[in-house]
Regions:
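Short loop/turn motifs that connect adjacent beta-strands in outer-membrane beta-barrel proteins
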Residues: 22-29, 122, 133-146, 157-159, ...
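Transmembrane beta-strands of outer-membrane beta-barrel pores
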Residues: 35-41, 150-156, 255-263, 315-319, ...
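Cleavable N-terminal export/targeting peptides
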Residues: 1-28
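Predominantly the C-terminal beta-signal and adjacent terminal strand-loop region
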Residues: 290-293, 298-348
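Short glycine/proline- and aromatic-enriched beta-strand/turn motifs that initiate or cap beta-hairpins
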Residues: 21-136, 345-347
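Extracellular/periplasm-exposed beta-strand and loop segments of Gram-negative cell-envelope proteins
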Residues: 46-48, 99-123, 155-230, 260-290, ...
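Residues on the lipid-exposed face of transmembrane beta-strands in outer-membrane beta-barrel proteins
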Residues: 128-134, 148-150, 233-241, 253-257, ...
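Amphipathic alpha-helical scaffolding segments
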Residues: 52-54, 149-153, 165-170, 254-256, ...
């Protein structure tokens, strides 16, 4: 009888010990599915637009096309052999008469206008992430392991904000007789001399010329759009600290890989300050494989033995994707992306 009692006690003790060990031994695998929201992803369009003849050119009273953005100078009926002409015109005497140098100033934008549109933000898009975590070793409150994830996010960035275009502007100075005053002119009511005249005379060739690079030449209006899908994976070591009975803090970092698929389009019109419009439209598609790194922190709430709520934030650097499509260069900045995640996990 005594032997039976001792055997029963030993078996009971072993069962309790085994049960306690199983309870203390956490589940080593966890899979989770989370919503993943990106922040701090930006895109920008840049490029150039050729400044040629306006689609609807301005003309003189005699039908000649303006040879400056803000006026014209041509030889008059006499042939201007004396170096003077009354066949000229301008838009604004307040800004185009240089009284100190007895000159009429006429200007034109030449070459290409450089375009740099405002940044577009990709905040608030919705994606997902499927993650697998494996504990490898550790103590009762701290565990070390690794994670592998698959994630996706779709981005749609667009803008119709206007901006200034810069280019090369040439300003030519035409002399008039000292002591005389050119006819008045104002925007919308410019002065226009005729081929046959008579009228106020100025020199038919400039006595000086100034070229300025990178000066604002007009305003760009229209729209720009970039649709991008980003498939990715993260692989790296993990650290988990069980700081409370049902809660733990996780830290991780490592390799990030992304496959980005881009569709870009634009429809823009450049309106020169001195008149004339130029329109440019286009589109393009491309994809690229990006390599980078990430760092992440999260919190796990184990509301049952196997089920948990997982949430956190991730910093990811996949560099800057850049591609030219015709007259535009598109840049998608993935170098400082922030992702916020929230989902549910299952341990086994």
């Amino acid at each position: 009888m005594k032997l039976h009692f001792l055997l029963l006690a030993a078996l009971t003790g072993a069962a309790v010990t085994a049960s306690t060990a199983r309870a203390a031994d956490p589940e080593r695998n966890r899979v989770s599915l989370s919503l993943r929201v990106p922040f701090n992803i930006q895109a920008r369009f840049s490029g150039a637009m050729t400044i040629g003849a306006p689609a609807v050119p301005r003309t003189t009273p005699n039908g000649a096309t303006y040879n400056y953005d803000d006026g014209y100078v041509f030889n008059d009926v006499s042939g201007s052999g004396d170096g003077l002409t009354w066949y000229w015109g301008y838009d604004d005497s307040a800004s185009q008469v240089d009284g100190a140098n007895n000159a009429v100033l006429l200007s034109r934008a030449t070459g290409n206008a450089s375009l740099s549109a405002p940044d577009m933000d990709g905040n608030g898009a919705l994606g997902f992430e499927l993650a697998y975590n494996r504990d490898l070793f550790g103590g009762e409150t701290t565990r070390f392991g690794f994670e592998a994830t698959l994630n996706y996010v779709g981005l749609s960035l667009d803008s119709s904000a206007s901006y200034r275009a810069c280019g090369t502007r040439v300003v030519d100075s035409f002399a008039f007789t000292p002591g005389t005053t050119p006819p008045g002119a104002s925007p919308g009511s410019g002065y226009q001399g005729t081929f046959n005249g008579p009228g106020f005379v100025i020199g038919n060739t400039p006595f000086s010329s100034t070229t300025t690079l990178g000066t604002p030449v007009g305003t760009v209006t229209g729209s720009r759009n970039l649709d991008a899908t980003l498939w990715g994976t993260r692989i790296g070591p993990t650290f988990e600290w069980h700081f409370a009975e049902k809660f733990s803090l996780t830290l991780s970092g490592g390799l990030a890989i992304g496959l980005v698929d881009v569709d870009a389009s634009w429809n823009e019109t450049l309106t020169l300050d001195a008149g004339g419009t130029f329109t440019d439209t286009g589109s393009g598609s491309d994809n690229d494989l990006r390599l980078g790194f990430y760092a992440a922190a999260g919190v796990v709430w184990n509301f049952t033995e196997r089920w948990s709520v997982v949430g956190g934030a991730q910093y990811q650097n996949l560099g800057k994707y850049t591609q030219s499509f015709g007259s535009r260069t598109v840049e998608l900045d993935l170098s400082k992306s922030i992702f916020v995640t929230l989902g549910i996990g299952y341990s086994f």
